[in-house]
From Swiss-Prot:
It comes from Caldicellulosiruptor saccharolyticus (strain ATCC 43494 / DSM 8903 / Tp8T 6331). Belongs to the RemA family. Transmembrane segments: none annotated. This is Putative regulatory protein Csac_2087. It comes from the Bacteria.
Length: 101
């Protein structure tokens, strides 16, 4: 990426944050090859389950060979990669309001 000096963070659901610069793919978990990738990552200790027990809707593959499971749709995660500022501004505003109480 051209912004290698900047770290872009994206929310993948339930307050879990991933570095957008490390993403290789955001895919649906439904196909057999992706299910195999998930199982292999689990066996290697490289699986991160960020679903909080919810149904896996997106599988995020990183450049470090980590596989991250998210309960957020792949399209939503992709949108957050493209437009990350909007999502964080909303999250920060909510947190600031809670801190002021």
């Amino acid at each position: 990426m051209s912004n290698s000096g900047n770290i872009k963070l994206i929310n993948i659901g339930f307050g879990n944050i991933v570095s957008a610069n490390r993403l290789i793919a955001i895919v649906s978990p439904d196909s057999a090859p992706i299910k195999r990738i998930i199982q292999e990552a689990r066996e290697r200790g490289m699986l991160i389950d960020a679903t909080y027990g919810r149904r896996t809707r997106a599988v995020i593959i990183t450049d470090s060979d980590h596989v991250i499971l998210s309960a957020v749709q792949p399209e939503t995660v992709a949108h957050r990669v493209i437009e990350p500022e909007e999502d964080f501004e909303e999250d920060i505003d909510v947190e600031d309001e809670v801190d002021k109480r």
